[in-house]
Amino acid sequence: MHKLVVAAALALLASSSAYSQNAAPGSARLMTSLPADSGTVTNYYKQNVYDPSDNKIGEIVDVLVDQEGRVNALIIGVGGFLGAGEKDVAVPFSSVRGKKKDNKWWLVMNTTKDALKSAPGYKYDSTKTQWVPEKS
């Protein structure tokens, strides 16, 4: 359920910020083509992240956007087995790059699984509808 809410929020944030900046009140701005440098959230959300040696180091569990609708951080689940014992950490969006490998979209980060495991943990607080630091 949380994932559906996040996807809907991303769509709402992106559309509302674009609307408020580029359109006059009461008029809808429609696109006749897509920006050449655009990507999709689905290329990141719920995707595995690998180190430069192609070892899986985690999975993206959330995509964070600023008030302008720009992606600025990713929450990556690291460690654990089938979600049990997993730790969620935050990384800057710019630290993950995408590449094509074997005709698939791969996300690569120049770090190790151990480095991610040692990073501060975060948990999703549904009452605040945001990620907050885990208490030690």
Regions from the PLM with identified roles:
Residues 2-8, 17-136:
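Peripheral interaction segments used for macromolecular assembly
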Residues 11-12:
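Repetitive helical segments and hydrophobic/amphipathic motifs
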